[in-house]
Curated annotation (Swiss-Prot):
InterPro entries: Kinase-like_dom_sf, Prot_kinase_dom, Protein_kinase_ATP_BS, Ser/Thr_kinase_AS, Ser_Thr_dual-spec_kinase. Heart, skeletal muscle, spleen, testis and lung. Its EC number is 2.7.11.1. It comes from Mus musculus (Mouse). This is Homeodomain-interacting protein kinase 3. Serine/threonine-protein kinase involved in transcription regulation, apoptosis and steroidogenic gene expression. Phosphorylates JUN and RUNX2. Seems to negatively regulate apoptosis by promoting FADD phosphorylation. Enhances androgen receptor-mediated transcription. May act as a transcriptional corepressor for NK homeodomain transcription factors. The phosphorylation of NR5A1 activates SF1 leading to increased steroidogenic gene expression upon cAMP signaling pathway stimulation. Interacts with UBL1/SUMO-1. Interacts with and stabilizes ligand-bound androgen receptor (AR). Interacts with Nkx1-2. Interacts with FAS and DAXX. Probably part of a complex consisting of HIPK3, FAS and FADD. Binds to NR5A1/SF1, SPEN/MINT and RUNX2. Residues 847-857 are annotated as: Interaction with UBL1. It comes from the Eukaryota. Residues 889-906 have a biased composition (Low complexity). GO terms for molecular function: ATP binding; protein kinase activity; protein serine kinase activity; protein serine/threonine kinase activity; transcription corepressor activity. GO terms for biological process: apoptotic process; negative regulation of JUN kinase activity; negative regulation of transcription by RNA polymerase II; peptidyl-serine phosphorylation; peptidyl-threonine phosphorylation; positive regulation of DNA binding; protein phosphorylation. Residues 197-525 form the Protein kinase domain.
């Protein structure tokens, strides 16, 4: 009997670097060689004996290149003698061994497959069905099951119930292979009852079918369609997958981080599932980066999101049963870094329908209860997740067993033997363990390699890169050597919590294993342990990254296309609140088109010729209102993160325009902005040496349109996380400002907007936060792709040692000076994308890490402080976007050896990367002491870019000391809550001001026009507490999100405080934050008079003396200045502590438009490097715990 198989072009089989569901690693348990490939899957021949017990060295002979010269649709008859092979999750493939012509001449056709290694033995290889079912090709066509009871979302099949139909070999249609796979042709049309999809590309072959990339006709949507096989052995599991997806379709896929299913339909007797298109799975991402370890700050959001998905699955009684890096997808690395979703529910089942002795999960991530044949539940997913995060941390699988014996052997050697009660109950315990009979007490022991080989004929071979005697030793792997001070302490504390959580996730006893909800409450995830390091830039970066990943639907409304930046400030997802704008002149400005990739806000245009922001920014930044005298962008970032940034004139930020018509803006009009609980705020994009970039087509809009749209819709509210139920906009500008009408003004939203998705789902994370204040609006920001990165940003990333092949912060710091002097043409040369081929990873050197600590270094520390600047430098030439990123691990590290040139194949070739003569070679012993690790400085996630800012640590204080002087500035606290239900206390900063000259006509700070409670609090500030756990004022360039993934972190920008005279009116805040259930006494006043400031104390400049480079920016205690309101930023500590970093600003550096600069005398002599221009600093936009707040 012959099958009709379509021959289709080679593009269908292109190796996928980004796919919804990439080709899966095969679960192979062969004889003779235990190594398998992941990129080039090993194939286990089922039911055939080729007399070859070793990997075939001629596997490539099966990769026949077919010149596709025949018209589409021509078929060829293939002999029935096909080779049946099995993939990882049980899917079968048919290799055409011989081809015959069928009516037309055609070249010999051999269906493309990955490199094959034929091995004998009828091993089931963890498959969910038996091989005998494969060969049951007799019988009539039959309907296996009907799935008529489905939600409306999935009942879209041409009016008929979903049927899984199978056909015999002799009667199957010519579009279906012998194993039930649908044979696709490019541009084939798949029709559901509602939509039509055109096949664009082949994405991957999975457990129960294949996945293709399709275009939804009539729209601009790209979807992924999973076409299930119609083989009878897959019918039941396909039905289960459809039913599970139907159940999940009623949940919020964005909130719970699993892939969204759109519809289900039938196409030629194949069930087709339509999913949202995702970008890249974690395994492909690791592979692109040569399996470099990821930093904990990047692992944490992945863990948090997957644990959230498992929490939901557990609540529904579902088991995913195939969690692995291949099934965790990056949603959109460009616009949503760190956002992941769980895919592939083809192996999922309900917990009540589990059967013991069932093979589930991929072997590397298979739980002990599955290996031993014990009853199992959702806890197997937690084991898999533990193995996944360990692999992300190590860059290599923790337990890469090629055989189940190897898998349980690795587990037992590191974590000890399973409990006797487990071995007694396990149905498969005797396969790997044997009872001791010559002992006084009966017990179990692991079979030796020789015993197992004698029984099974399979020879084990070491596949681990790291051999741990205990999971505690993981803490010493890939130690970051470039951190110091608070950053180093924070990293060590983070590692301890990570290992603590990992041990709980990898408990052999499933009953004791940590649950998803407990995981989410673990200190490693909620970062409570990092609150003890408020000045650490590592901590700030950790909080910042977690803020990003907690916005699941942030980009849905803008992820399809970038729109013109000149648009109404009011966004669709915001509440329709009217803004009190009267007597506001029109604005004349020019729209920056999308081709310029500007990062200004939607409603904040730039002039033509000033679009220097040709930088691929993963999220959109906004600008402050810059007085005409202030120009430039920062040229260096090596300053303490809590203070103002200096500005150079090298690259103008806002150019002046001739005054045509003054624009009168009422005081406080632009001040009613919301604080983002999601991300850090910013005022100016702080790229260094931005290449000038004019807009492609800048159009001059009419005054009426620009003015009415921008200002008329200003002030609407953005929904945020349900951590807060109120929005507290602080005053931004509290005095009148006169601007020229044609001059482009960059208004300081200082806010990254995370709107709700367009589709209405229940239980959103981003719920509307009620606001009883004046009607305000914050517009969406344009999503900018980081694939176009400014020269300055590239230079920050490009400080890479060619030998080390990874970016360290020390290098970035060294290159900072030189990068300022380079012209933009040099920067442009460094913006070429580097495509990294699937090069193998380093030699698989087995490193035994014992818990016995020695205090000796195993290798000298190479120099990390300079960049060669040559064209050979990988990172210097790359934009390092997240989906095409250089590998930045060191070749000379004994632990991070994953990118050396002579390396062995990476885990994609995972256990069988070494030849037989290489086995057991390269073993090294690394002591378990922290000092013995020699690869920390080579770790690809060394974040020394924040080392310069690590010298701000001061002692934490408690509220005490009634003798403090009145503050020299004002501060208001915006909310930055992390955990719901946390009590919040506050520690005010102790100020050391010795004299407070008052400006004429203004009251003394903290004394006049102050409520009694506030005045008392002002007179009794706490001890010096100028620290914070996470300063959202310090804003990182989002375009460097890919650097975070690869362990290279760009500098963070800071926000500017705008000093202005205060004209304020009282208003009432409706505060519903769980962190702030009570109003503090110092903020409880309700009798603020208009025009009078609410003052909170600032720390003295002495307490910030460690920040010498910005001493000129600190508040001068003896200098006259206007009374400012500087909102400060705080972190809600679980124990009820709020850490603040109020910042004093020398008004000389930022003159108010209504106050002349000569009225201020800086206490410090001017420095040559700041004399270029005035500077402005950043500030958060929303206070916290306020019942009355003056504005306007």
């Amino acid at each position: 009997m012959a099958s009709q198989v379509l021959v289709y072009p080679p593009y269908v089989y292109q190796t996928q670097s980004s796919a919804f569901c990439s080709v899966k690693k095969l679960k192979v348990e062969p004889s003779g060689c235990v190594f398998q490939e992941r990129t080039y899957p090993q194939i286990h021949v089922n039911g055939r004996n080729f007399g070859n017990s070793h990997p075939s060295t001629k596997g490539s002979a099966f990769q026949t290149k077919i010149p596709f010269t025949k018209p589409r649709g021509h078929s060829f008859s293939l002999q029935a003698g096909a080779i049946v092979v099995k993939d990882t999750a049980g899917a079968t493939k048919v290799l055409a061994a011989q081809a015959q012509q069928a009516g037309v001449e055609a070249p010999r056709a051999v269906v493309w497959r990955n490199r094959l290694h034929f091995l004998e033995g009828p091993q089931r290889c963890g498959l969910k069905r038996k091989s005998e079912e494969l060969e049951n090709h007799s019988g009539a066509m039959q309907i296996v099951d009907e799935l008529s009871i489905l939600p409306a979302m999935l009942q879209t099949n041409m009016g008929n119930p979903v049927t899984v139909v199978t056909a015999t070999t002799g009667s199957k249609q010519n579009c279906t292979s012998g194993e039930g796979d649908y044979q696709l042709v490019q541009h084939e049309v798949l029709c559901s009852m509602k939509n039509t999809y055109e096949v664009l590309d082949f994405l991957g072959r999975g457990t129960f079918g294949q996945v293709v990339k399709c275009w939804k006709r009539g729209t601009n949507e790209i979807v992924a369609i999973k076409i299930l096989k119609n083989h009878p052995s897959y019918a039941r599991q396909g039905q289960i997958e459809v039913s599970i997806l139907a159940r999940l379709s009623t949940e919020n896929a964005d909130e719970y981080n699993f892939v969204r299913a759109y519809e289900c339909f039938q196409h030629r007797n194949h069930t087709c599932l339509v999913f949202e298109m995702l970008e890249q799975n974690l395994y492909d991402f690791l592979k692109q980066n040569k399996f470099s370890p990821l930093p904990l700050k990047v692992i944490r959001p992945v863990l948090q999101q997957v644990a959230t998905a498992l929490k939901k699955l557990k609540s529904l009684g579902l088991i995913h049963a195939d969690l692995k890096p291949e099934n965790i997808m990056l949603v959109d690395p460009v616009r949503q870094p760190y956002r992941v979703k769980v895919i592939d529910f083809g192996s999922a089942s309900h917990v009540s329908k589990t059967v013991c002795s069932t093979y589930l999960q991929s072997r590397y991530y298979r739980a002990p209860e599955i290996i031993l044949g014990l009853p199992f539940c959702e806890a197997i997913d937690m084991w898999s997740l533990g193995c996944v995060i360990a692999e992300l941390f190590l860059g290599w699988p923790l337990y890469p067993g090629a055989l189940e014996y190897d898998q349980i052997r690795y587990i037992s050697q590191t974590q000890g033997l399973p409990g006797e009660q487990l071995l007694n109950v396990g149905t498969k315990s005797t396969r790997f363990f044997c009872r001791e009979t010559d002992m006084s007490h009966s017990g179990w022991r692991l079979k030796t390699l020789e015993e197992h080989e004698a029984e099974t004929g399979m020879k084990s071979k070491e596949a681990r890169k790291y051999i741990f005697n205990s999971l505690d030793d993981i803490v010493h792997v890939n130690t970051v050597m470039d951190l110091e001070g608070g950053d180093l302490l924070a990293e060590k504390a983070d590692r301890r919590e990570f290992v603590n959580l990992l041990k709980k996730m990898l408990l052999i006893d499933a009953d004791l294993r940590i649950t998803p909800i407990e995981t989410l409450n673990h200190p490693f995830v909620n970062m409570k342990h990092l609150l003890d390091f408020p000045h650490s830039n590592h901590v700030k970066s950790c909080f910042h990254i977690m803020d990003i990943c907690k916005s699941p639907s942030s980009c849905e409304t803008n992820n399809h296309s970038k729109m013109s930046l000149l648009r109404p400030v009011a966004s669709n997802g915001t509440a329709a609140l009217a803004a009190n704008f009267t007597k506001v002149g029109t604005l004349r400005s020019q729209a920056l088109t999308t081709s310029a990739h500007s990062v200004v806000h939607h409603g904040i245009p730039l002039q033509a010729g000033t679009a220097q922001f040709g930088c691929g920014d993963a999220f959109h930044q906004t600008l402050i209102i810059c007085p005409p005298a202030i120009q430039g962008i920062p040229a260096a970032h090596g300053k303490p993160t809590s203070y103002s940034i200096r500005v150079d004139n090298t690259v103008p930020l806002v150019t002046q325009a001739p005054a045509v018509q003054p624009l009168q803006i009422r005081p406080g009009v632009l001040s009613q902005q919301t604080w983002s609980g999601r991300t850090q705020q910013m005022l100016i994009p702080a790229w260094q040496q931005v290449t000038p970039m004019a807009p492609a087509a800048a159009t001059l809009t009419s005054e009426g349109m620009a003015g009415s749209q921008r200002l008329g819709d200003w002030g609407k509210m953005i929904p945020h996380s349900n951590h807060y139920n109120s929005v507290m906009p602080p005053p931004l500008l509290t005095n009148q400002i006169t601007l020229s009408a044609p001059q482009p003004i960059s208004v300081g939203i200082a806010h990254v907007v995370w709107p709700q998705p367009a589709t209405t789902k229940k239980n959103k994370l981003c719920q509307n936060r009620s606001n009883s204040l004046q009607n305000t609006n914050i517009p969406h920001s344009a999503f900018i792709s980081p694939k176009i990165i400014s020269g300055k940003e590239v230079e920050e990333v490009s400080c890479v040692d060619t030998q080390d092949n990874h970016t360290s912060e020390g290098e970035a710091g060294t290159c900072r000076e030189a990068s300022v002097r380079q012209d933009s043409s040099v920067s442009d040369k460094q913006r070429q994308t580097i495509i990294i081929a699937d090069s193998p990873s380093p030699a698989v050197s087995v490193i035994t890490i014992s818990s016995d600590s020695d205090d000796e270094e195993t290798s000298p520390r190479p120099s990390l402080r300079e960049c060669k600047g040559s064209l050979d430098c990988e990172a210097c030439q790359s934009t390092l976007n997240i989906d095409r990123m250089c590998s930045l691990s060191s070749p000379d590290s004994t632990l991070s050896t994953s990118s050396s040139g002579q390396s062995s194949p990476s885990p994609c070739k995972r256990p069988n990367s070494m030849s037989d003569d290489e086995q057991e070679s390269g073993c090294e012993t690394v002591d378990g002491s922290p000092t013995s690790d020699s690869s920390g400085h080579d770790s690809p996630f060394a974040e020394n870019s924040f080392v310069e800012d690590a010298h701000q640590n001061t002692e934490l204080g408690t509220c005490a000391g009634p003798e403090a002087k009145p503050a020299v500035g004002t501060a208001v606290e915006p909310p930055v809550g992390r955990e719901s239900g946390l009590s919040v206390d506050e520690h005010m900063a102790n100020t050391d001001s010795t004299c407070q000259p008052l400006r004429k006509g203004q009251p003394a700070p903290g004394k006049l026009h102050q409520p009694p409670a506030l005045g008392a609090r002002q007179q009794k500030p706490a001890a010096a507490f100028p620290q914070q756990h996470l300063n959202l004022s310090q804003v990182q360039h989002f375009g460097t999100g890919h650097q975070e993934w690869n362990g290279n972190f760009g500098h963070r920008r800071q926000q500017a405080y705008i000093p202005t005279s205060v004209t304020s009116n009282p208003f009432t805040l409706s505060h519903g934050s769980p962190n702030h259930t009570a109003v503090h006494a110092h903020l409880a006043g309700s009798t603020h008079l208009g025009g009078q400031p609410t003052l909170l104390p600032y720390p003295s400049s002495a307490s910030l003396s460690s920040a010498a480079p910005v001493a000129h920016l600190l508040a001068s205690p003896c200098t006259s200045r206007p009374m400012l309101q500087h909102p400060t930023y705080n972190i809600s500590h679980p124990s009820g502590i709020v850490h603040q970093v109020p910042v004093g600003i020398n008004p000389r550096l930022l003159p108010s438009p209504t106050i002349h600069q000569t009225q201020y005398k800086p206490i410090f002599p001017p420095h040559s490097y700041i004399a270029a221009s005035p500077a402005y600093t950043g500030f958060p936009l929303s206070p916290t715990k306020l019942s009355q707040y003056p504005y306007m």
